[in-house]
């Protein structure tokens, strides 16, 4: 899934170049490129599909030049994950009615790839013999209120998923701490494994407002009229996540506990943990930025330029972002930042979105 806007990472992530096409690390590969490279170790490349927006066609092609044209599915509008997954599911079913699929966001950071690959292969093997709707749940290493949590209904056993008891979307810090202490909760990774026909049946049962629009898909997908068909039905497509549309309604939701290192790089706080370099005072920095920091601590300092010095004195818990056309300086407080970024919707800032 590579169609998000990444608005919480403004001004680095913009509508015309969202975060899946950016490289926040020092590896020279975008999130999309790294996700594709990670998945092709487990999934044959001819079976990897990318769902993105029509406006990002050229960027996807630039980052993944080897991707077959038929494996690039283009939505006219972003309608969240449930419509995106429905689109991919119908396209996969047309090619292989018995397919077992993995659904993954394109903008997550994953380490310990050997553990990730083992977990994915085990989940695929289990899903192939059942109708279970499986999500990978990451064993939490800290109480983090930026992630969603999944409560297990029972004790985890090696090689088998556990029934899901509850979902909690981004609890406050105190509740997140309680969750981690109980050892009943996992981070919701947003990575899913299931048979294509199983998720189709679940979507038809719990989200008919999506699947009813897809009437006629067998005749439309894979033809010259595919894009026109998709563009037409998306004018009425609801905006809803797969968790709300299906996973929180079904009694067939399972979680596979996993211990690979994972992070949803969804906001500046998560990027603070992810950035490659932290100085002795807790400032998170990208290595290419030229900076002079004095009496400053626990800041996020990021620059897209290497020809400009960032001189900072006396700042604590701030975000300082410097790009070609925008300089942003604001406290790290997430709620204040959210309110601040919401003002970008005003017409006078349109050229900077």
Region roles according to the model:
Residues 32, 88, 107, 150, ...:
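Residue-level signal for inorganic ion chemistry
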């Amino acid at each position: 899934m590579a169609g998000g806007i990444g608005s919480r990472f403004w001004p680095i992530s913009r509508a015309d170049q969202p975060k899946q096409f950016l490289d926040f690390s020092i590896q020279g590969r975008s999130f999309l490129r790294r996700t594709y490279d990670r998945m092709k170790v487990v999934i044959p490349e001819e079976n990897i599909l990318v769902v993105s927006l029509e406006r990002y066609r050229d960027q996807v092609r630039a980052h993944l030049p080897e991707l077959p044209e038929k494996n690039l599915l283009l939505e006219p509008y972003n309608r969240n994950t449930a419509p995106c997954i429905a689109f991919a599911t119908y396209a996969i079913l047309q090619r292989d009615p018995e397919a077992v699929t993995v659904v993954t966001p394109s903008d997550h950071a994953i380490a310990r790839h050997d553990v990730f690959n083992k977990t994915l292969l085990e989940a695929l093997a289990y899903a192939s013999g059942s109708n279970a709707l499986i999500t990978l749940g990451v064993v939490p290493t800290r109480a983090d209120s930026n992630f969603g949590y999944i409560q297990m209904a029972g004790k985890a056993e090696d090689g088998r998923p556990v029934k899901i008891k509850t979902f909690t979307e981004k609890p406050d810090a105190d509740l997140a701490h309680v969750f981690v202490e109980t050892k009943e909760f996992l981070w919701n990774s947003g990575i899913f494994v299931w048979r294509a026909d199983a998720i189709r049946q679940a979507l038809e049962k719990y989200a008919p407002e999506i699947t009813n629009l897809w009437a006629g898909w067998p005749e439309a997908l894979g033809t010259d009229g595919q894009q026109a068909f998709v563009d037409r039905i998306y004018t009425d497509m609801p905006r809803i996540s797969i968790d709300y549309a299906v996973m929180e309604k079904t009694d067939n939701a399972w979680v596979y506990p996993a211990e690979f290192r994972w992070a949803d790089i969804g906001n500046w706080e998560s990027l603070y943990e992810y950035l490659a370099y932290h100085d002795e005072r807790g400032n998170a920095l990208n290595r290419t930025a030229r900076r002079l920091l004095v009496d400053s601590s626990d800041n996020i300092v990021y620059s897209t330029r290497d020809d400009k010095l960032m001189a900072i004195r006396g700042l604590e818990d701030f975000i300082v972002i410097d790009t070609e056309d925008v300089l942003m300086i604001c406290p790290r407080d997430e709620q204040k930042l959210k309110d601040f970024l919401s003002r970008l919707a005003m017409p006078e800032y349109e050229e900077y979105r």
